[in-house]
Amino acid sequence: MKTISLVYISLSGNTESFVTRLKDYLLSQYKRIEVQKIHIKDLVKEGKNFYEMDHPYVAFLPTYLEGGNGVDNGDVEILTTPVGDFIAYGNNASKCFGVVGSGNRNFNNQYCLTAKQYSQRFGFPVLADFEMRGMLEDIKHVAAIIADLYELEKEN
């Protein structure tokens, strides 16, 4: 049995929706897996300490910024910084396969900017991106990436 860990934060419900649908899709398509959702907001809200991951994971990060346009006059990450703190804890950054960014394309250059910044900060790739709650095609695309990373076997 392989454990797939999805580390994320959801503030408006969009990322929660995507990660939940992704979990359901993975469980329906691949055998001998369990999918663990780790919602950083819940850890913070419940006052739980961050911990070191003992196996690889994929991070999911929405974009919440204030100030600037994200390109030539700056930006400030807001609300999602606990994810960065979790990734920075112990050796967690080295266990992260990469980040999946989300956002709203209406914000142009700021779309998925936080995921791109985490990629640079921690040295792992941006694996994919999706807008708002994501579509079924986004779920399938991210699931295929996860299947490759974890070397999963199809359910057929």
From Swiss-Prot:
Domain of life, per lineage: Bacteria
Pfam families on file: Flavodoxin_NdrI
GO biological process: protein modification process
Molecular functions per Gene Ontology: FMN binding
S-S bonds: none
InterPro entries: Flavoprotein-like_sf (IPR029039), RNR_NrdI (IPR004465)
Name of the molecule in the record: Putative NrdI-like protein
